[in-house]
């Protein structure tokens, strides 16, 4: 860590030509012009002080002189008057030379202005020293701010920065100043606001004001921001004398909020002392901090705030910020109550909430949503961002003025979790920005038992925010008024600039990680200090009593009033008989379900379309709907091929997707497709965004030109992130059931970078939080000799997490069996072998009366496979998604002659049919495709097995035996046939890697599995 004083040597003050655009201290911008000063435009070698940073300072002086010549030193007045009179470079502070031959009058005039030979160099150096001093405070002052309420550590972990960085003579000497200069008056640059209405101050007062602005209980990190207007805005907020003032009414409100925050935790501790609740003790100021951000944002027009936070203090936020009924919170502590809703539920400090109420400060309606989250710290960050983006989209809030997000973090997780970085880098991307998030870090200076010095390599836990130029406000949480001021500024920053901002609440944790944990094992000295520490409520109450803002009886009455509220709610909680998880829903869908949360029907209409619609979409997909738009020659051939397919009434994979999307847009369903390179498609098959070859950045999205009143289509290339982007899209899909939200992995192999979102949100989300989600994952999958990282979407992992029982045969005679299966499952897993079926499953996702995540293993080689085509006939009215595609060749005509029935899924079907034809076994081997793997199509497969009574059964897959679908399909297929026959395996041997990287080995393995599949004697020895 550099010392504050050493940084000044590297400073380069901002030039006046830059500052003219922004804040000046009550100086008219119109007067600030530099056209007449010759030292600004002429070569500067002749003026020894007009070089480097000196020239910048001279411009500052010139600005001041233009407004008021008496505001600068007399020597400067002479210099500028001489220069304006036309003195050549190098002579403005001496007797001026003749301007031209014969111009004696001009010479006489210029010479009369020179009254003295000032020591200009010394004067400039002194003023530059003061300017460097001011800038040093602005850059490094936060390092010596009094941030730690315990007084143990500097919040930035750097104990080597001396607290008396300026006041001693040797420190002043670094700047070329000494104690004799302390009472000298110096003109202030336009890059500071410490002067208020004054343009010059004594050095002693300059230092005092800088200390007050930057070295007390607030530390401001902002000088890395590369926007001058934003820097000036922040300087004005923190440097202006007396700006941090609160009315008595505001102080009383702050005290009341602290009472609620503190007494809530104390009440829980009294009633349930042995329960984990991850209390807020040590950072009780978080509650008034959040309420201040919400109040200020509401005042600025925000009417919907979406929040995400970890477990620490969550119950307090639910109770005192979102205003969840206290009895509902207290019920969660009753171990005797049973859950009324299906699913596992979740612990109380993970639950979300949605509530609409009146903001009492602004008297405006505001909706607050706290997103449910797992214990995986920071995982909810992109989810909150995605939900915020969706809510902004649906209400037409293109600038983020109505809907905003607040994210809470712990210090250790904020520094340690990579998803924080991924989320920050979404913050300013056009298709992902939420126009500014307020981040609040509960910096209790410990991560469970880990010291901050072992938890991060950076000075602050917030340093990650610097990558997006977000200002960072560090504040001592034991100074509630400083916290409130910082939160007001943060809300104003977001409202003004629509960019991220970070509030770092430097606090402590009074108890262990949870209430049952003993922190003295690992932090004995820290906790000895904490035991002595007065609670912030007591400190602030004593301060207000001493100021006469409140008296002791009023304070005690506030406490007793809230205690009574808690006791009454506790009594009501005893009347509750069951726990309702649905009371904790964070994203309700009004009107989609019945009042009791059930689907309005248990059926799905046909997903087919009329030929007119198919043809119209196909024609648009094969053309450029914009005039004077030049596309690439290769793309012209692709569009021509599409047009020929439409004429022939067939579709390939890309065209089937186009038709599914286009038809849903016609029905008012917004579609959002996101992922790496999805606009073109990793395999150059999609081309949903056309690029003009002659005009840079000119693009066209034909999908948005289909129908007059269609829903908008959003297709957006994402950043190179899986975890963050999938979380974002999951959050987007939470907001409304009437949108098809898809995330496509570049290759299915890369989805495991987002495994946390899949495991903690998508798979169990409904079971834990009674929250449905219709997100679609497109995962390119197929063994094609491309190596172990470009072959497998790991279907075995998705199938292993399906919630059906492989050993129980459901009631196949149940009405709407297939729809009931879908309703009961936790997600749907499909592997389509035809474009038509892909078309149907996308449309079914929206036409179902409920929402489930959809996992689709999409093809790669089939995108251009000549046999992977579907006729319009497969997509017309009356057609549906086929869960199973049965054999329809000669084997199906004479089923009694079939020796083997092969079950498979996906691309391997085309390898099998080719091999079967080559071996002339089309009548002996039947091939049935399972298109929907989960929920398992027991009913249809039973019919297939019964159709071929003499056939032995085998499962064929191109994946290795310990991967793919075999371990999922075999027990369910055995259950289907009551274990009457064995189910043999034809496929690759077990392996650690998903695929070989050697092409020859790949082909050898493929031929071996085909030999196994069609050798009718191979399983006889195992019988």
Swiss-Prot record:
InterPro entries in UniProt: 2-oxogl_dehyd_N (IPR032106), 2oxoglutarate_DH_E1 (IPR011603), DH_E1 (IPR001017), KGD_C_sf (IPR042179), ODO-1/KGD_C (IPR031717), THDP-binding (IPR029061), Transketolase-like_Pyr-bd (IPR005475)
UniProt-listed GO biological process terms: 2-oxoglutarate metabolic process; generation of precursor metabolites and energy; glycolytic process; succinyl-CoA metabolic process; tricarboxylic acid cycle
Catalytic activity: N(6)-[(R)-lipoyl]-L-lysyl-[protein] + 2-oxoglutarate + H(+) = N(6)-[(R)-S(8)-succinyldihydrolipoyl]-L-lysyl-[protein] + CO2
Modified residues (Phosphoserine): 100
Annotated organelle transit peptide span: 1-40
Residues where N6-succinyllysine is found: 74, 564
Protein's name according to its UniProt entry: 2-oxoglutarate dehydrogenase complex component E1
Source species: Pongo abelii
